[in-house]
């Protein structure tokens, strides 16, 4: 069965995307860590889902098992964070946590599903922020992590073409809880 995967499916962007793809009669598999919200959305849209936290070691292994009979035709990695604070009070762990969530986890996902993605000429959409290029005050944590996402995007787009398309969207403020 051909499906799109939406990571962060219960967030503002992820849930909006899930609803839009439902309206377009596309099949999706929703991924998120909030089990109650994920079940509610999946039941409403009649989508399959996996409760998983991308910050947990071996999360990708469980996901690949859940998707063993699925042809993945697209991934939307709508997971993210925004920690805004003056640089002088940041800690190394702030940067590491943001890099793991925004960059490292998605590399585990893509690597784990690489053969599946290639076979299906899939598309991967990652998210950055305008802060990665604009230099906003107190955005050093998120802008550096999302700049890394943009670097990964152009590198993987070159490396994985023509079988897998990798793109990155860098929105400004959105109408969501996180914003």
Label for each model-derived stretch:
Residues 10-11:
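Conserved glycine-rich cofactor-binding loop
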Residues 115, 157-162:
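Alpha-helical segment proximal to the catalytic Tyr-Lys
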Residues 129:
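Residue(s) in the substrate-gating loop at a strand-loop-helix junction
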Residues 110, 145:
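Active-site helix of classical SDR
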Residues 160-174:
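Conserved Rossmann-fold SDR core element
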Residues 86-87, 91-99:
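Substrate-binding pocket helix/loop in short-chain dehydrogenase/reductase
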Residues 90, 135-143, 155:
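Active-site loop-to-helix junction immediately N-terminal to the catalytic Tyr of the SDR YXXXK motif
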